[in-house]
A protein has these predicted regions:
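Charged, alpha-helix-forming regions
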Residues: 1-283
Length: 284
């Protein structure tokens, strides 16, 4: 019998990746960024070219951002939402300095003109290591700013497979209110569902006590990609390396995920391959 089930077209996947130094994953600010602000920042970071050494003024069409709805087409709303980023400095961990995401932002006739803050050059340009990388679609699919922040924290640690943080520190990075643990658990359960349904990550979490009181949150993290997909991505990465494109295309996310599933090729473990790729990348 002929299958008459209607095929649902799959959404075209973005081919661009967000790459940022791990210090930018743990930023703290006095005011929480909105989900639209976070998506804008991620999208514009993904537009940085691998060989760029400076932050020129660039432009992007509002309609090309991939997360704009009818409400966002309103100029007044857009100006209030995005230009507010110029007034939202954050502290860079392990640096101690305050920075804004942008030194220049302008919106005119559906076009955003922007330039990143030059103080962010060491954290966004010519990265050799200690960075997190993921496909842009992961954050574009999320619906809350808290889900985006937690997704990045988990991606940073996906190669290790776990993340343990003090609850107090976690709340500061997430910019969450001072929830009691019971309410925090319920809230995290909602965020967990959102992340698992919309990104490449699967994870669980639990509170860890010190004495009689819970002091830490422990996340256990897995990549949802199939073994077959990971092997295919590893082969693609190897071909790119063969063609001399290691600086442009070195995909830490793919290799770490492959290590996690213990895929091996030509009797050499991917852990060793990853180490070799690091050495190649550091020489660029």
């Amino acid at each position: 019998m002929k299958d008459t089930t209607k095929k649902i077209p799959t959404k075209k996947k973005n081919s661009i990746n967000v790459v940022k130094h791990n210090s930018l994953i743990n930023i703290k600010s006095d005011e929480a960024f909105t989900v639209s602000q976070k998506k804008l920042v991620c999208h514009l970071i993904a537009n940085i070219k691998p060989k760029e050494v400076d932050f020129p003024i660039k432009e992007v069409a509002l309609k090309d951002l991939g997360f704009i709805d009818d409400n966002m087409q309103n100029y007044t709303w857009f100006r209030k939402e995005f230009l507010q980023l110029l007034k939202m400095p954050f502290i860079i961990p392990n640096d101690g300095g305050w920075a804004n995401w942008f030194s220049y932002l302008k919106y005119e006739k559906g076009i955003i003109k922007y330039s990143f803050d030059p103080r962010l050059k060491p954290f966004l340009l010519e990265l050799k290591g200690n960075f997190t990388m993921y496909n842009l679609d992961n954050v574009l699919n999320l619906k809350t700013n808290y889900a985006i922040t937690l997704f990045e924290l988990l991606m940073k640690n996906i190669g290790i497979g776990k993340l343990k943080m003090e609850i107090e520190e976690f709340m500061k990075i997430m910019n969450l209110p001072n929830y009691p643990n019971g309410e925090l658990k319920r809230y995290l359960t909602r965020i967990q569902k959102e992340i698992i349904e919309n990104t490449i990550i699967n994870f669980s979490f639990e509170f860890v006590k010190q004495g009689a009181k819970a002091k830490y949150i422990l996340f256990k993290i897995k990549n949802k990609a199939s073994k077959k997909d990971l092997q295919s991505n590893v082969e693609e990465t190897k071909n790119l390396l063969k063609n001399g494109k290691q600086q442009e295309m070195f995909n830490e996310e793919i290799v770490v995920a492959a290590i996690e599933t213990k895929i091996e090729d030509n009797n050499q473990s991917l852990r060793d391959k990853f180490k070799n790729l690091r050495m190649i990348n550091d020489r660029q």
